[in-house]
């Protein structure tokens, strides 16, 4: 066999993570209500299927956009030809307006500062190529999306240094943890080029607070060579939009728009989570740095968004009545679905981190661990995947420093499937509790037997000792 390149054969792609292994097991045995009711239910996929009816209704009412027409006339030939790498201006304008609407119109976005990419994965990698050299490092708060080990590192050669967090403060970013991560990178002789956050957080399902954002901005203001990348692809999934604060708002509110910090803050966005369109492969980089925009535009030729996709979505996003209703209804449905999962888990004795965004919950299964170790977490995860038949993501795949946390997705299935998943989890919890009761009872019987034996031995020793003394006295 001919030897492939080092890049093709290296193990830095991150695909060996339990996050991806769970997907592989699901693909071998996918659940289907009629064809395979005993199959694995996919709860490791952050996909939003709750508002497809709204999108389908819009398509039915807007046949020109759906059939690639303009005023009843076909634009097929126009769309079939090569397009400028910058993208269709109509789509970029509509996308920029949608980003502003998604953030409560508290900030505005210039479409000239947008670079279109084939999804957020491509956007994040392109930013790494623009901002860092191989061997440089980015600081990431933990826990973080497992795919970042592939997206940020594999082809770019960039290293990730974790900013550790814990459940004691709800996994919030602290100044101390940020500084410790920076010092750790320096000890490893790594040149830190930036910080990357997901806001709202994947996997936590929480929005980054004003306090946390100020900590980050204070840090990059003090350290002049460090960038801040905010992956905001879940901005449209916040149950209450006022709870989400974009980094662009901090720039505005902290009066940093006329400082050098402006050019070191970048946003990654997409329509995969907000509109539930991951198959359309629409992402973007937003930056105020013209050099970043220029370089990223050149690199975008390796992952363009098709003209047909841009044409269709420019019409959809330009329909303000639709987008306003969609965002409101999407938030409502996500909130209701998240509540069903949380209440269902609480009913069987499992708690979740309090969340206000995302397509998943950060679930605390520490009470189900046989020991407080990552080995015990993996044992539990394997049992859930292979026996319970649910694909969920273990916290260790997200680089969580505490064993026993799991990411569980809830928006990629119908209500009946969620109910079945909860039923399966209940059986797991019942089995674990029953097993522990039996173990406890066995242990108590064993301890009782030992106490009885020791009591008999003590009595025998006492009698023997008494008779010895009696003989001596005689």
Curated annotation (Swiss-Prot):
<dbReference type="GO" id="GO:0009835">
    <property type="term" value="P:fruit ripening"/>
</dbReference>
<keyword id="KW-0832">Ubl conjugation</keyword>
<dbReference type="InterPro" id="IPR004839">
    <property type="entry name" value="Aminotransferase_I/II_large"/>
</dbReference>
<comment type="subunit">
    <text>Homodimer and heterodimer. In vivo, the relevance of heterodimerization with other ACS enzymes is however unsure. Interacts with XBAT32. Interacts (via its C-terminal region) with ETO1 and EOL1.</text>
</comment>
<dbReference type="InterPro" id="IPR015422">
    <property type="entry name" value="PyrdxlP-dep_Trfase_small"/>
</dbReference>
<comment type="pathway">
    <text>Alkene biosynthesis; ethylene biosynthesis via S-adenosyl-L-methionine; ethylene from S-adenosyl-L-methionine: step 1/2.</text>
</comment>
<dbReference type="GO" id="GO:0009693">
    <property type="term" value="P:ethylene biosynthetic process"/>
</dbReference>
<feature type="binding site">
    <location>
        <position position="47"/>
    </location>
    <ligand>
        <name>substrate</name>
    </ligand>
</feature>
<feature type="modified residue" description="N6-(pyridoxal phosphate)lysine">
    <location>
        <position position="273"/>
    </location>
</feature>
<keyword id="KW-0663">Pyridoxal phosphate</keyword>
<keyword id="KW-0949">S-adenosyl-L-methionine</keyword>
<dbReference type="GO" id="GO:0016847">
    <property type="term" value="F:1-aminocyclopropane-1-carboxylate synthase activity"/>
</dbReference>
<dbReference type="GO" id="GO:0030170">
    <property type="term" value="F:pyridoxal phosphate binding"/>
</dbReference>
<dbReference type="InterPro" id="IPR050478">
    <property type="entry name" value="Ethylene_sulfur-biosynth"/>
</dbReference>
<dbReference type="GO" id="GO:0042802">
    <property type="term" value="F:identical protein binding"/>
</dbReference>
<keyword id="KW-0266">Ethylene biosynthesis</keyword>
<dbReference type="InterPro" id="IPR015421">
    <property type="entry name" value="PyrdxlP-dep_Trfase_major"/>
</dbReference>
<keyword id="KW-0456">Lyase</keyword>
<keyword id="KW-0292">Fruit ripening</keyword>
<feature type="binding site">
    <location>
        <position position="85"/>
    </location>
    <ligand>
        <name>substrate</name>
    </ligand>
</feature>
<dbReference type="Pfam" id="PF00155">
    <property type="entry name" value="Aminotran_1_2"/>
</dbReference>
<comment type="function">
    <text>1-aminocyclopropane-1-carboxylate synthase (ACS) enzymes catalyze the conversion of S-adenosyl-L-methionine (SAM) into 1-aminocyclopropane-1-carboxylate (ACC), a direct precursor of ethylene.</text>
</comment>
<protein>
    <recommendedName>
        <fullName>1-aminocyclopropane-1-carboxylate synthase 4</fullName>
        <ecNumber>4.4.1.14</ecNumber>
    </recommendedName>
</protein>
<comment type="similarity">
    <text>Belongs to the class-I pyridoxal-phosphate-dependent aminotransferase family.</text>
</comment>
<dbReference type="InterPro" id="IPR015424">
    <property type="entry name" value="PyrdxlP-dep_Trfase"/>
</dbReference>
<dbReference type="InterPro" id="IPR004838">
    <property type="entry name" value="NHTrfase_class1_PyrdxlP-BS"/>
</dbReference>
